[in-house]
Amino acid sequence: ESVSHDIGKTRIFTNLSLCVNKNEKVLILGRSGLGKTSLFRLLLGFEQAGSGKILVNGLNLDKAHVHQIRQQLFYLSQDIDLRDETLNNLVTEIWEFNFDRKLSRETIEQLLTFLELSPGILEKRTGDLSGGERQRIGLLIGFLLNRPIWLLDEPTSALDNAMKKKIAEHLLSLDKTMIIISHDHCWQDSSAVRIERWS
């Protein structure tokens, strides 16, 4: 609410107000340099606003609540950064970390099938993945973590058109709150999203 933000001497935005309701899907459109990614960094507590108030599920985004808020968020960055390890190790860590529900190996295999990834990809190291594979593994991590709020920065940019449409339709059907930054028409053409145009 009424958030202003600077990086160095550069003003990113002034008096920004944005309300996203539970399970709502909001698509932010606008050219580069308008602060769309900075909005995500503010919500994650990686950057601090110069003025204004940020609330996430009723919690004020401050040092006292930032860890609690991050536990509610899943962030898929445009350039997803994965530790250099095998995907099997990465998935196992997430599996063991997720205390909210039981994750079976069958569930993971079903997700891989949906993402059109073979089970053998789990033997690959993260550094050996193509751009499209990295993006789909990022989405796999999101499904496994099962957080209530998703921040998606160009989540389908490296995928072909058929996969873009498949992923967008599925994500928009989930009972999740989502803020999406994307130039892909699969998001813009959906009636399930509220479009915010920044200029």
Name the predicted role of every residue range.
Residues L44:
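Helix-to-loop junction immediately C-terminal to a conserved catalytic motif
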Residues W150-E154:
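Catalytic Walker B motif of ABC-type/P-loop ATPase nucleotide-binding domains
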Residues G52-N60, I69:
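Conserved ABC transporter NBD signature motif
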Residues L103-I121:
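Conserved ABC ATPase "signature" region
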Residues D79, D84-K102:
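Q-loop/switch helix immediately C-terminal to the Walker
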Residues L139-L140:
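Hydrophobic anchor residue at the start of the ABC signature
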Residues R125-L129, E133:
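Conserved ABC ATPase signature
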Residues F143-L144:
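ABC ATPase C-loop
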